[in-house]
Design a protein with these regions (language model features):
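Conserved acetyl-CoA-binding loop-helix of GNAT-fold acetyltransferases
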Residues: 78-96, 244-247, 253-266, 293
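Short amphipathic alpha-helix that is part of the acyltransferase structural core
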Residues: 1-30, 147-188
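A short helix-loop-beta-strand connector motif used in the catalytic cores of GNAT acetyltransferases and
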Residues: 28-45, 193-207, 224, 241, ...
């Protein structure tokens, strides 16, 4: 499988489809690179774009305020060399754009987690793996963890708004240590607005864990009709998105998170969800082992340079 010099983006995409299918059965069919800015080099092509968060939006808590994104498709056989050429071309493209040197910017490259052939090129260009998109297929059971007496999992409702926001902010503050998440002055207000809408809606897929009457954990997820934004990242359908899970520090290690995950997984499986996706921070020492025990494994890795101009 090879790409000739001068071969167009559609030819690259066709070859990448074959390559991705051999790497990971959960990867999607690569999308056609049509519309917007498309970069091509021998052996690779990519769509590149730019996202800017709206003031007051909760999206600003999940990363830099301005994100320059490259979505590469590399066919081979020299994946490292082709990706190196593509990243060099993108760096030159970014140099011509305003604002890439501002502090609150990031250059972001999503890359299949199992495609280790590209890792060296990403590192050589100053990109680091910050966030993981992990996947669980329907029916995969998590590791059973005794939760002890007095633990109750129940659906959350509008009266639980304060508890949900408090636990959500604990998660934002904790994850801010690891490079992707940013607690901003208006993050709590933005979270409150979003959660209020969620809890007021039908079947909000939001659960609280209580022990002896005190709230100690939270999980909320997006149903397939809400998760269309992330569904293209995997082949099976329908897709749900586990948006947030939090356990109070004093309650960790006692099976609270596993109990919440089990309740969610039962609901998702009953609803016919084929794959649940979630994000976790690569450097969070708790996330990778926990989510692996719950039946998740890495599907995509977001590689970043901050600010965007720091990319080499």
């Amino acid at each position: 499988m090879s790409v000739r010099a001068g071969q167009d983006a559609s030819a690259v995409t066709a070859l990448v489809a074959e390559r991705w299918a051999g790497l990971d059965r959960l990867l999607p069919v690569p999308p056609a690179l049509a519309g917007g800015d498309v970069l091509t080099v021998p052996g690779a092509a990519a769509r590149c774009g730019h996202w800017a968060g709206e003031p007051g939006s909760l999206d600003l808590a999940w990363g830099a305020a301005r994100r320059f994104r490259l979505e590469p498709q590399v066919a081979g056989p020299d994946v490292r060399g082709a990706l190196d050429r593509l990243l060099t071309r993108w760096r030159e493209h970014l140099a011509g754009l305003p604002g890439t040197g501002e502090d609150d910017t990031a250059a972001v490259v999503p890359w299949p987690s199992r495609d280790i052939a590209g890792h060296r090129a990403l590192l050589d260009h100053g990109l680091i793996p910050l966030a993981i998109i992990a996947a669980r297929t329907a029916g995969r059971d998590g590791q059973a963890v005794p939760s002890g007496p007095g633990l109750r999992i129940r659906p959350a409702g509008p009266a639980d708004l304060d508890s949900v926001v408090a636990l959500g902010m604990e998660t934002i503050r904790y994850d801010a240590h690891f490079g992707t998440v940013i607690e901003r002055p208006d993050s709590a207000a933005a979270l409150r607005r979003e959660v209020a809408v969620r809890l007021a809606g039908p079947a909000p897929w939001t659960w609280l864990a209580e022990r002896d009457g005190s709230v100690v954990g939270l999980l909320y997820a997006q149903r397939p009709d809400q998760a269309g934004w992330i569904a293209p990242l995997t082949r099976p359908a329908p897709v749900a998105y586990l948006e947030l899970m939090a356990v109070r520090p004093g309650a960790r290690g006692a099976g609270v998170g596993a109990a919440l995950a089990a309740v969610y997984h039962a609901a998702a499986d009953a609803a016919g969800v084929a794959v649940t996706l979630l994000h976790y921070e690569q450097m969070n020492p708790l996330s990778a082992p926990f989510w692996s025990q719950q039946g998740y494994r890495p599907l995509w890795t977001d590689w970043e340079a901050r600010p965007a101009a720091a990319m080499r």
